[in-house]
A protein has these predicted regions:
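N-terminal interaction/assembly modules
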Residues: 1-86, 134-141
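N-terminal positioning helix adjacent to the helix-turn-helix/winged-helix DNA-binding module
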Residues: 76-79, 90-92, 124
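Short, conserved sequence motifs enriched in acidic/basic residues, glycine, and aromatics
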Residues: 86-87, 115
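Short amphipathic alpha helix immediately N-terminal
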Residues: 87-104
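Hydrophobic positions on the alpha-helical face of helix-turn-helix-like DNA-binding modules
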Residues: 95-96, 109-111
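Amphipathic alpha-helical binding modules
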Residues: 105-108, 114
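DNA-recognition helix of helix-turn-helix
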Residues: 114-135
Length: 141
């Protein structure tokens, strides 16, 4: 795994949480949008598992998955923060934090850190990843 991939795990875990949140909202909508159809015909009622039961079962599963994903996310963030905090150069720590932990765009990072153009921030990012790799693996190259 490259150093960049190591940091991208944070964003991947965030995407998983957003997906689970969307599923949770779907089950909430299912549970709250229950309508009963009365036709007057015998046997016209719904058979089997109701929408409420389906929504409740789905919601319980999603909440369990969300709990596990938040725990995983927290662990990944702590690992990334630990690695970043050990990088000697402050500007590289800031750049990696803004990009991978805060999720800032390249143009926002460039503005925030005073880089004159995107190429400068890309170049600094490359150097920051090299420094992170040195720290992670305890190497000078």
């Amino acid at each position: 795994m490259t150093t960049k991939d190591y940091f991208l795990r944070v964003r991947a875990a965030e995407r998983e949480i957003r997906l689970l949140d969307a599923k949770k909202r779907h089950y909430e909508d299912m549970g709250f949008s229950i309508t009963t159809k009365l036709t007057g015909m015998p046997g016209s009622g719904q058979r089997g598992v109701s929408k409420v039961e389906t929504a409740a079962i789905g919601m319980a599963d999603i909440l369990s998955d969300l709990k596990h994903q938040y725990e995983r996310y927290s662990k990944i963030v702590k690992e990334a923060e630990n690695l970043i905090s050990r990088i000697p150069q402050g500007k590289y720590r800031q750049l990696l934090t803004l990009r991978y932990l805060v999720g800032m765009s390249w143009s926002s990072i460039s503005d925030e850190m005073g880089y004159k153009d995107r190429n400068s921030v890309y170049r600094a990012h490359g150097y920051a990843l090299l420094e992170a790799k040195k720290v992670k693996y305890g190497k000078e190259n």
